[in-house]
Amino acid sequence: MSGQGKRLMVMAGGTGGHVFPGLAVAHHLMAQGWQVRWLGTADRMEADLVPKHGIEIDFIRISGLRGKGIKALIAAPLRIFNAWRQARAIMKAYKPDVVLGMGGYVSGPGGLAAWSLGIPVVLHEQNGIAGLTNKWLAKIATKVMQAFPGAFPNAEVVGNPVRTDVLALPLPQQRLAGREGPVRVLVVGGSQGARILNQTMPQVAAKLGDSVTIWHQSGKGSQQSVEQAYAEAGQPQHKVTEFIDDMAAAYAWADVVVCRSGALTVSEIAAAGLPALFVPFQHKDRQQYWNALPLEKAGAAKIIEQSQLSVDAVANTLAGWSREILLTMAERARAASIPDATERVANEVSRAARA
C-alpha cells in the first residue's frame, strides 16, 4: 500500500511505552513513502530519541495535571489553551493528512488541534485501562484502537507494536526444546529498576539454589547494591547489569521472566513467547494489573500483586514450573500475541487519511 506524498504527525511522549510503539508505526509508514513528523515536549525522552530515528520533531509546552497543587489546576485551562494554539500552528504549517495519538500529555492538545482543523485523529491505547487523555480524545477520534481488551468497550483490539528483533525470535518450540540444566530466570526492572525485585530476588536465588541461573537487570545506579545482595545471600554467581541493550537476545536466553507489567513489556514477552511472573506496579487505577491479566487468563503467566509479594511466593511459583510447564506457557504466550500490531495500526492510519 503506497503512501507516496501522504503526511502523518505522530503525537506521543513521556515514556518508552508511548514513544517506541509510535516509532514502530512511523518506520512502517515511512517505508511506504509517507512523510512523518512528531509532536512532543522538549523536556521528555522523545526530544532526544525521535531525531535519532531520522524523524523531525516539533515541541509544545504541556505537562500532566495529576498530583499538582491547586494553583496548577487553576492555571490548567490557560496552559491547555496555549498548548492547543501551539499545536494548531504547527499543524497548519505541516498540513498532515492524519494524526496518530499514541498517548502522553502531548496527545491532548495535539488531538484537539487536529480535530479543530478537520484533520482525522487516530488513537491507540497501549494499556489495559485507558489514560485520561485518550478517554477525552476518544469522543472526537476517527478511529480508536486498543492493545488489550477492556480499555474501551467497543474499540478494535490490535495489540502493541513491538520491535522487529523481538518478533524475529525463533518460536518457543524451536528455542526451548532440548534445554537442560538450571532454569534461566530473566529479572527485568525497567530503566529505573524495580526496588521490590532488587530486594526480593537475591533471597529467592538463595532458596532455589542450583536449580536456577539468574540475569538481573537492576536499573540505573543499582548494580553494585544488587550484586552485593546476591553475594550476601551466598549466590554471587548470578549476572547483574544496570541495563540490557539487546532485549531480544535476553529474551532468547531466558526460560522465564520476572518483571513489572508495563504495556510494552507484556506485549514483548507475548511476542517473544515467554512465560512470566508479573509483579504489577501499584498504581491507583491498577493499569499494570490489567495489562498482565490477559496472559494470566491464557495460562501463560502468573500475577503476584506487590502487596502479596514475598520470597516464598516467588520461589514456590518458580519451583513449581517444570521445563514442560514452561514450554506450554511459552507457547500460550506466543499464541496470545498479536505479531502484526504495527501493520494493523498503520493500515488504520492509511484508511483515515483516504477517508
Curated annotation (Swiss-Prot):
InterPro entries cross-referenced by the UniProt entry: GlcNAc_MurG (IPR006009), Glyco_trans_28_C (IPR007235), GlycoTrans_28_N (IPR004276)
Pfam families tied to this protein: Glyco_tran_28_C (PF04101), Glyco_transf_28 (PF03033)
Cell compartment(s), UniProt: Cell inner membrane
Main location: membrane
Topology relative to the membrane: Peripheral membrane protein
GO molecular function list: UDP-N-acetyl-D-glucosamine:N-acetylmuramoyl-L-alanyl-D-glutamyl-meso-2,6-diaminopimelyl-D-alanyl-D-alanine-diphosphoundecaprenol 4-beta-N-acetylglucosaminlytransferase activity; undecaprenyldiphospho-muramoylpentapeptide beta-N-acetylglucosaminyltransferase activity
Chemical reaction(s) catalysed: di-trans,octa-cis-undecaprenyl diphospho-N-acetyl-alpha-D-muramoyl-L-alanyl-D-glutamyl-meso-2,6-diaminopimeloyl-D-alanyl-D-alanine + UDP-N-acetyl-alpha-D-glucosamine = di-trans,octa-cis-undecaprenyl diphospho-[N-acetyl-alpha-D-glucosaminyl-(1->4)]-N-acetyl-alpha-D-muramoyl-L-alanyl-D-glutamyl-meso-2,6-diaminopimeloyl-D-alanyl-D-alanine + UDP + H(+)
HAMAP family: MurG
Function: Cell wall formation. Catalyzes the transfer of a GlcNAc subunit on undecaprenyl-pyrophosphoryl-MurNAc-pentapeptide (lipid intermediate I) to form undecaprenyl-pyrophosphoryl-MurNAc-(pentapeptide)GlcNAc (lipid intermediate II).
Protein name: UDP-N-acetylglucosamine--N-acetylmuramyl-(pentapeptide) pyrophosphoryl-undecaprenol N-acetylglucosamine transferase
Organism: Escherichia coli O1:K1 / APEC
Designated gene of the protein: murG
